[in-house]
């Protein structure tokens, strides 16, 4: 049996190691690109969601005070999106359904917006006509605003409403959609929305909207997992057999290295932070002391719920962004409990003044992607989002002062992609069950709290005229790589 930490052999990260004609021999490996509804569609012809309210009412929560009302205008330009995908030679497109576009009130009782259904039918049909497989995320953080008010910001159970919403999608699109992702990064919504207040609804212990950073993130995360479980159970009972699809979820994928690799406290801290921020999103706690650490603040699953949750993945998606150093930090006083400090770990990007990896909008050490993949050795994995570092931050006003040619010549992204694909090649050759690689993102888009200041993507977009889209060097390289 292979060890989940077996990847000790030297990784060859030369650029030419990932451009060979036959990159892997594994059958049914999928290359794709990804987006999400709020980040690309625009707000036209749908009801408000929590991000609409949040960015309009509190623009200071976004780094450039921008809003996602237009974004890439994919609602009107979806055929252009598909043309980009076709030009890139990808076999799949991961996108999300905007909950408020199909259920304006968030609930079936509030009525179905057939125009929204038509939009997604058109998108799915266009993808299929071009030989591109749709991978659909059911929920990517955009709770309908009317629904959010009624359920008190996800702090009350919403399983039946989410299940009904998911069933609507299974009914209307399941004849063509064969890959369903219930939730995108449940950890992020729970922590950013209820731990530090940076995402809607902006709740935390010290936030003006109120909240409790020591309890609410765990309640929300618990409800997210139960909603996932209910949707999976429904799909398997009523739809999977005759529709022939698969269903899973997506976690934020991070790896942690002890700041001092000879210090036992730092070693334990790295393991514990992984447990909190990655495994915690699956309902799994591998260190019993963590349950003791959280006590009654951690909601409990019934034995039946635990059993259903344990078997609720046909595949697991990982969004890999970052590697960080971890060092021991004493736990907070009982009166200062917070999801941000409960793990008793301080994380950072530098050791003795040296960055852990490439300095960009994110920091990464590419070899640690291999460790992350190894950890989930016996699960079918889809690497659903690898954020390609932005060469620079560029506010849309500043773009008038820069040459578009510089933005398009993103050679750093090419090396980033190449290094990650080299690691995946090693992992697959050693038996890791990695079934796909999806680059984030198809095109420059609205990056939630960062607004339009970051460009992670393989196609340049003019945010004042989203029909103006231009292929970057990384997009051309990715296209050639897939075609070989």
Swiss-Prot record:
<feature type="glycosylation site" description="N-linked (GlcNAc...) asparagine">
    <location>
        <position position="260"/>
    </location>
</feature>
<dbReference type="GO" id="GO:0005739">
    <property type="term" value="C:mitochondrion"/>
</dbReference>
<feature type="disulfide bond">
    <location>
        <begin position="204"/>
        <end position="207"/>
    </location>
</feature>
<feature type="binding site">
    <location>
        <position position="39"/>
    </location>
    <ligand>
        <name>a beta-D-glucoside</name>
    </ligand>
</feature>
<feature type="glycosylation site" description="N-linked (GlcNAc...) asparagine">
    <location>
        <position position="28"/>
    </location>
</feature>
<dbReference type="InterPro" id="IPR033132">
    <property type="entry name" value="Glyco_hydro_1_N_CS"/>
</dbReference>
<feature type="binding site">
    <location>
        <position position="456"/>
    </location>
    <ligand>
        <name>a beta-D-glucoside</name>
    </ligand>
</feature>
<feature type="binding site">
    <location>
        <position position="140"/>
    </location>
    <ligand>
        <name>a beta-D-glucoside</name>
    </ligand>
</feature>
<keyword id="KW-0326">Glycosidase</keyword>
<keyword id="KW-0378">Hydrolase</keyword>
<dbReference type="GO" id="GO:0019137">
    <property type="term" value="F:thioglucosidase activity"/>
</dbReference>
<keyword id="KW-1015">Disulfide bond</keyword>
<dbReference type="Pfam" id="PF00232">
    <property type="entry name" value="Glyco_hydro_1"/>
</dbReference>
<feature type="glycosylation site" description="N-linked (GlcNAc...) asparagine">
    <location>
        <position position="462"/>
    </location>
</feature>
<dbReference type="GO" id="GO:0008422">
    <property type="term" value="F:beta-glucosidase activity"/>
</dbReference>
<feature type="binding site">
    <location>
        <position position="440"/>
    </location>
    <ligand>
        <name>a beta-D-glucoside</name>
    </ligand>
</feature>
<keyword id="KW-0325">Glycoprotein</keyword>
<dbReference type="GO" id="GO:0005975">
    <property type="term" value="P:carbohydrate metabolic process"/>
</dbReference>
<dbReference type="InterPro" id="IPR001360">
    <property type="entry name" value="Glyco_hydro_1"/>
</dbReference>
<dbReference type="InterPro" id="IPR017853">
    <property type="entry name" value="Glycoside_hydrolase_SF"/>
</dbReference>
<feature type="binding site">
    <location>
        <begin position="184"/>
        <end position="185"/>
    </location>
    <ligand>
        <name>a beta-D-glucoside</name>
    </ligand>
</feature>
<feature type="binding site">
    <location>
        <begin position="447"/>
        <end position="448"/>
    </location>
    <ligand>
        <name>a beta-D-glucoside</name>
    </ligand>
</feature>
<feature type="binding site">
    <location>
        <position position="321"/>
    </location>
    <ligand>
        <name>a beta-D-glucoside</name>
    </ligand>
</feature>
<protein>
    <recommendedName>
        <fullName>Putative myrosinase 6</fullName>
        <ecNumber>3.2.1.147</ecNumber>
    </recommendedName>
</protein>
<comment type="similarity">
    <text>Belongs to the glycosyl hydrolase 1 family.</text>
</comment>
């Amino acid at each position: 049996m292979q060890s989940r930490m077996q990847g000790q052999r030297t990784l060859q990260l030369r650029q030419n190691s990932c451009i060979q004609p036959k990159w892997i021999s594994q059958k049914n490996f999928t290359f794709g690109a990804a987006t999400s509804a709020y980040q690309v569609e625009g707000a036209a012809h749908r009801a408000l969601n929590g991000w609409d309210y949040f960015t309009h009412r509190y623009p200071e929560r976004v780094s450039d005070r921008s809003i996602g009302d237009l974004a890439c205008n994919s609602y009107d330009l979806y055929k252009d999106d598909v043309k980009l995908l076709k030009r890139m030679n990808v076999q799949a497109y991961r996108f999300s359904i905007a909950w408020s576009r199909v259920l304006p009130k968030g609930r079936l009782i509030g009525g179905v917006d057939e125009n929204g259904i038509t939009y997604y039918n058109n998108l799915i049909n266009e993808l299929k006509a071009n030989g591109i497989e749709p991978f659909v995320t059911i929920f990517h953080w955009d709770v309908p605003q009317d629904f959010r008010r009624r359920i008190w910001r996800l702090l009350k159970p919403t399983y039946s409403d989410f299940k009904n919403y998911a069933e609507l999608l299974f009914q209307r699109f399941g004849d063509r959609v064969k890959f369903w992702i219930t939730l995108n990064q449940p950890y992020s919504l729970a922590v950013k929305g209820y731990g530090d207040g940076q995402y809607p609804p902006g709740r935390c212990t010290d936030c003006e909207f109120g909240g409790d950073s020591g309890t609410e993130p765990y309640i929300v995360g618990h409800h997210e997992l139960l909603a996932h479980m209910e949707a999976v159970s429904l799909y398997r009972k009523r739809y999977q057999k005759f529709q022939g699809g698969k269903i899973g979820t997506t976690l934020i994928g991070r790896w942690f290295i002890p700041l001092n690799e000879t210090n036992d406290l730092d070693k334990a801290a790295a393991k514990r932070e992984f447990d909190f921020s990655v495994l915690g999103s699956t309902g799994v706690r591998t260190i019993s002391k963590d349950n003791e650490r959280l006590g009654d603040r951690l909601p409990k699953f019934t034995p039946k719920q635990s059993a259903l949750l344990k078997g609720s993945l046909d595949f697991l998606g990982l969004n890999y962004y970052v590697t960080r150093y971890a060092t021991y930090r004493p736990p907070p006083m009982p009166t200062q409990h917070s999801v941000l400090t409960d793990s008793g770990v301080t994380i950072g990007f530098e050791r003795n003044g040296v960055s852990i990896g490439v300095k960009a909008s994110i920091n990464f050490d590419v070899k640690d992607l291999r460790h992350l993949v190894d950890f989930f050795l016996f699960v079918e994995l889809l690497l659903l989002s690898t954020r390609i570092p932005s060469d620079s931050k560029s506010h849309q006003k500043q773009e008038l002062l820069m040459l578009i040619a510089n933005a398009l010549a993103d050679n750093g992204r090419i090396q980033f992609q190449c290094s990650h694909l080299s690691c995946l090649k090693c992992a697959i050759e050693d038996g890791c069950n990695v079934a796909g690689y999806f680059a984030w993102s198809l095109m420059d888009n609205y990056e939630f709290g960062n607004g339009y200041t970051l460009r992670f993507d393989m196609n340049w977009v003019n945010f004042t005229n989203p029909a103006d889209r231009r292929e970057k060097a990384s997009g051309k390289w990715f296209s050639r790589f897939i075609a070989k």
